[in-house]
A protein has these predicted regions:
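Short N-terminal helix/helix-N-cap motif within the alpha/beta-hydrolase-1
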Residues: 101-105, 132
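A SAM-dependent methyltransferase catalytic signature shared across enzymes that methylate proteins
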Residues: 162-177
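Conserved class I S-adenosyl-L-methionine
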Residues: 122-143
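Adenine-nucleotide cofactor-binding loop residues
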Residues: 75, 97, 128
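Acceptor-substrate binding/catalytic loop of class I
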Residues: 144-161
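A short glycine-rich, Lys/Arg-flanked "PGG" loop and its adjoining helix->strand segment in the class I
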Residues: 104-119
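Conserved N-terminal segment of class I S-adenosyl-L-methionine
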Residues: 1-90, 104-107, 138, 177-219, ...
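A short SAM/SAH-binding and catalytic strip from SAM-dependent methyltransferases
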Residues: 89-101
Length: 224
């Protein structure tokens, strides 16, 4: 099996900050090395944290911080195992949904069981990022070991299609923002080119530039 994004020990603080503070039961799909569990449990030691991790090595690392770890793909859990994850106050998909064959089915499956006050916190790569647009413009589309062109990505999302992913599965995006890295800001010529393309296609130029700045989208969705 092809290895997913290389493990690291740096938590996604934007995801951490979107987890409702009162969450007593959390399920994280793709718990990797367990660093998000580590950081959340520093603040909320009484939380019961379940990790689901498809990679055996990462699953073992997750056990350092998670109360329970399932070595499995969330897409392959049978009904008994899936039902055992409920109730949960928050589900986390930090750089995971893009790796799934059918993220729509996974979200619908959660929606059919989730309580009204629960949340989903997700981080998804932005295929509309200016670097992607620039590379596609010159015919450069080469898969890599990590990043926007991670070779294990199966799905691609813009801000609008990310919102549609949740809306079409019974959720609505309650809050969120783009992850913008200052060292990856586009130059004036790139910005102008994005504005020109937006205007040529009848889109809002300012929105197009703003959407191109986000490397990833980090959002919290709730049942609609």
């Amino acid at each position: 099996m092809m290895k997913q994004t290389p493990v690291n020990e740096i938590p996604n603080l934007e995801v951490l900050n979107l987890i409702p503070g009162g969450s007593k039961r959390i399920v994280e799909a793709g718990s990797s090395s367990g660093v998000l569990a580590r950081e959340y449990k520093k603040l909320h030691a009484d939380c019961h944290y379940t990790g689901i991790e498809v990679d055996a090595e990462y699953a073992e690392l997750s056990r350092r911080y998670c109360d329970v770890v399932l070595h499995a793909s969330i897409e392959n859990l049978d009904d008994r195992a899936f039902d055992g994850l409920f109730p949960a106050d928050c589900w986390i998909f930090a750089d995971v949904l893009e790796h799934l064959v059918d993220p729509w089915s996974v979200l619908r499956r959660i929606r059919s069981r989730i309580s009204a006050g629960a949340s989903i916190v997700a981080c998804l790569p932005n295929v509309q990022h200016w670097s992607m647009q620039a590379n596609i413009n010159r015919g450069h589309f080469v898969y890599e070991d990590s990043g926007l062109l991670d070779r294990t990505h199966l799905r691609w999302f813009t801000r609008l299609s990310m919102a549609d992913l949740f809306q079409s599965t019974g959720f609505r995006v309650a809050e969120g923002a783009g992850r913008i890295y200052s060292h990856m800001e586009p130059g004036a010529k790139i910005r102008a080119a994005i504005q020109t393309m937006a205007e040529a296609t009848g889109a809002n130029a300012e929105v197009a530039v703003n959407d191109a700045l986000a490397f990833q989208w980090v959002v919290r969705a709730v049942p609609a």
